[in-house]
From Swiss-Prot:
It comes from Rhizobium meliloti (strain 1021) (Ensifer meliloti). Belongs to the FliE family. Pfam families: FliE. GO terms for cellular component: bacterial-type flagellum basal body. This is Flagellar hook-basal body complex protein FliE. It is found in: Bacterial flagellum basal body.
Length: 111
């Protein structure tokens, strides 16, 4: 569950470091390596972007499935799209569970 969330962060780190600085693997091991880190967005912005990406992935999988029904896509393309959508959904579920757990812990705190 945590691995899926960390892999999302790794993909964004790789995208940021492409074309500049040392190899992406070096910046994954040492976050300070490479170029100066850009300003991170707010937590709500990051969650919004992840949600948008998950929805886009699921719509893409649905579209690929419909193409396969019409005979325009092969089985491998459908499986790849559906597996990508499933991974996005599992990540969203894991984040939701963590947020609910954190909320319940805060609600149980004594003031």
């Amino acid at each position: 569950m945590i691995d899926a969330i960390q892999s999302v962060g790794a993909f964004s780190t790789i995208r940021e470091t492409e074309g500049a600085g040392p190899a992406p693997s070096a910046s994954l091991v040492m976050p300070g390596a490479g170029t100066a880190a850009p300003q991170a967005g707010s937590f709500a912005e990051v969650l919004g972007n992840m949600t948008t990406d998950a929805i886009r992935s699921m719509k893409s999988a649905e579209g690929t499935s419909l193409q396969a029904i019409r005979g325009e896509a092969n089985t491998r393309e459908v499986v790849d799209a559906v597996m990508s959508a499933e991974q996005s959904l599992q990540t969203a579920i894991a984040i939701r569970d963590k947020v609910v757990t954190a909320y319940l812990e805060i609600a149980r705190m004594q003031i």
